[in-house]
C-alpha cells in the first residue's frame, strides 16, 4: 500500500477521486510508515539511527505533554500528544523487531492477555470469577519466574 501525503488526492476503487480528509490512516499505515522511516538505506536519516537510549528523553517529554493536555482539558492537543506517545511506543517496538526480539503485535497480544487475565469476572469461566486481584498478580509473578528459569 502506498502512503499518501497530506493534501494529495486519493483514488478509490473505480477511479473515484476522494479528498484526503475523507480517508483516515490506519494502524497498519503507521506500521508501514515506521518501517519506511527506519529503513537503513532509504529511510529518514534521523529516525533510522535512533536507539532505545536516544529516544528515552522523547518518551518522557511526550508523556509529560499528555499529562499537560489532560490537566488543561485540551482534548484536541491530547489527541495529538497521544499520537506522539504512540509513535514512541512504535519506534521502540520497531527497534526490537529489527533485533528479532518482538513486534508491536506481540506487545498488543501481551496487553490483551493481561487485561483478560486480570478481569476474570468479565472474561473468565465460572471458576475464575472468584479470583482476587492479589491472587491474579501472584499467578502472574509465578509465571514470569517460571519463564525466566527455563
Task: Please provide the spans of the model-predicted regions.
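Flexible "arm" and connector segments at domain edges
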Residues: 18-81, 87-150
